[in-house]
């Protein structure tokens, strides 16, 4: 999940 959160933080943000 952490990994996913890192990608999500720099993806849509």
UniProtKB/Swiss-Prot annotation:
<protein>
    <recommendedName>
        <fullName>Unknown protein CP 10 from 2D-PAGE</fullName>
    </recommendedName>
</protein>
């Amino acid at each position: 999940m952490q990994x996913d959160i890192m990608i999500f933080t720099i993806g849509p943000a």
